[in-house]
Amino acid sequence: MTATQTPAKEVVEPNSEDTEFVFFSGKGGVGKSTVSCATATWLADNDYDTLLVTTDPAPNLSDIFNQDIGHEVTAIDDVPNLSAIEIDPDVAAEEYRQETIEPMRALLGDEEIQTVEEQLNSPCVEEIAAFDNFVDFMDSPEYDVVVFDTAPTGHTIRLMELPSDWNAELEKGGSTCIGPAASMDDKKADYERAIDTLSDESRTSFAFVGKPESSSIDEIERSASDLAELGISSQLLVVNGYLPESVCEDPFFEGKRADEQAVIDRVESTFDQQALATYPLQPGEIAGLELLSDVGGVLYDGEEATVDVDAATRRATNEDTVDFDTFTDADAVAEELVPVEETRYLFFTGKGGVGKSTIASTTAVSLAEAGYETLVVTTDPAAHLADIFEQPVGHEPTSVGQANLDAARIDQERALEEYRTQVLDHVREMYDEKDDTQIDVEAAVANVEEELESPCAEEMAALEKFVSYFEEDGYDIVVFDTAPTGHTLRLLELPSDWKGFMDLGSLTKGAAPANGGKYDEVIETMQDPSRSSFAFVMYPEFTPMMEAYRAAMDLQDQVGIETSVVVANYLLPEDYGDNAFFENRRAQQAEYLEEISERFDVPMMLAPLRQEEPVGLDDLREFGADVTGLDGVGEDDREEVTVS
């Protein structure tokens, strides 16, 4: 192993006797997990006892290392000094419930225990339980370094905020939706220590991973600024997957490479106070120890980046002709997108970074062009609809310059304020109707106000806003650009979870009038294939395909929702890239398209890689005509819709 001292190596290599921590984050789909795994492998190979932890609800460490990992700390085969764990939010929540309740059983009666159990049925418990695991691993003296492969950017920021938020909540004492505060004094100390450690640059390093694309780097800039406000600075930026110069032999890919290099130049000037490392796109997927070692060698040992076409797995020969069009039926796709008799709700979801927002926006423009009154909404905390439309997109539906089309994004702070107002107004009305002079109304309202300061109120507020879009008047179609896969499942499970919690009689959760019935209607609408369509967006590689498939199965099993459409994005154009590198990647894509078709067995929308991402209405119209199957659908073709 060489001893070259790269800037990236200085960031990740431990230099003290205390356990150190390295966090990798970034827009989903940029190779964050690959870089995390490569870093952990490199550290272990250099004799550091290393633990790799993913807090992403859609983990893929098992796929990268080609072995089962799961919720227990697992030794990685053939890598001494390396262990890994994929935190399972469901398992973590149950463990948290049992750890909270068991010490109380000898002290409290059955009625009191039942009250605690009811509190712990709050959906917020899953969030704090996952974080509880996260905090536990920040107190792991048996390791030299703990590498965190964190959830995609918007949710990572939320995770980073949790220590302060829950600490403030526990300061108040009394009862919380995560259990009685008096039982969690030890948690309070843990959270205080976590806050101190996260902001200690001598022990904690924060690294972003991005693709050489403007949207990816824009996201990193925003996230780095948000982290700085929390007192956490980032020290490393890894630009992953740039096109190697040696394989770009035609104007299309020469142009894409030039664009990428311009982005890398921008990164060098914008992030000049941070270490910068780059790694090229390979002809095949990065999995297995040999390729992970290559990534680590380039990033941390200063080895020259190489592209070995022959090293990629290739199941097709150079003589094979790849015809992507055989995998799609445009009419079948269009049938799943247009309304029948009532307002249709379209959900585009998938692993972050697969082009989900672009596909959702493109589909919305095409539907509006066809004459349907359309609203496109993003529920993703890392939203960028405004960048795609080149128009302001706010909390309330507003026009983006296209007839029949409005757009909105959920502003979490405003949603929380709206929810607080809704709850407090209803509480006051409820006590006014009782007209009981023995009740101290202001004290009761003050108690509710305090409960609304809990971090879990943010989750309920986001849900309320999400549900409100099912009540928007005047739209034939509402298109949801949802958060990345694991978090989308959490959002879609919330109506059922919160309804169950509200049935327990919790004042705050049940303060909004008739919420239970409203949630029932939303659940039924999402489960009705004549009114709701769920489309999984992916690029045709193993990890995004499997994450989408697992998520689709979870949707079916946990929420009773069937997948309607799959979207295969970033297909390599057949007219360009006439060499072994792109032939290999194109053949690989065809192989995965076949597997996607077999696994999902639903209509497939195909979207090609473009010279530039479609931005602005003109680009979106052109792109939509090519990919949605809606070209030619107009006023004369569509049925009369009864809008909500």
Swiss-Prot record:
<feature type="binding site">
    <location>
        <begin position="26"/>
        <end position="33"/>
    </location>
    <ligand>
        <name>ATP</name>
    </ligand>
</feature>
<dbReference type="GO" id="GO:0016887">
    <property type="term" value="F:ATP hydrolysis activity"/>
</dbReference>
<comment type="similarity">
    <text>Belongs to the arsA ATPase family.</text>
</comment>
<keyword id="KW-1278">Translocase</keyword>
<comment type="function">
    <text>Anion-transporting ATPase. Catalyzes the extrusion of arsenite. Involved in resistance to arsenite and antimonite but not to arsenate.</text>
</comment>
<keyword id="KW-0059">Arsenical resistance</keyword>
<keyword id="KW-0547">Nucleotide-binding</keyword>
<dbReference type="GO" id="GO:0015446">
    <property type="term" value="F:ATPase-coupled arsenite transmembrane transporter activity"/>
</dbReference>
<dbReference type="InterPro" id="IPR016300">
    <property type="entry name" value="ATPase_ArsA/GET3"/>
</dbReference>
<keyword id="KW-0067">ATP-binding</keyword>
<dbReference type="InterPro" id="IPR027541">
    <property type="entry name" value="Ars_ATPase"/>
</dbReference>
<dbReference type="InterPro" id="IPR027417">
    <property type="entry name" value="P-loop_NTPase"/>
</dbReference>
<dbReference type="Pfam" id="PF02374">
    <property type="entry name" value="ArsA_ATPase"/>
</dbReference>
<protein>
    <recommendedName>
        <fullName>Putative arsenical pump-driving ATPase</fullName>
        <ecNumber>7.3.2.7</ecNumber>
    </recommendedName>
</protein>
<feature type="binding site">
    <location>
        <begin position="350"/>
        <end position="357"/>
    </location>
    <ligand>
        <name>ATP</name>
    </ligand>
</feature>
<dbReference type="InterPro" id="IPR025723">
    <property type="entry name" value="Anion-transp_ATPase-like_dom"/>
</dbReference>
<dbReference type="GO" id="GO:0005524">
    <property type="term" value="F:ATP binding"/>
</dbReference>
<keyword id="KW-0614">Plasmid</keyword>
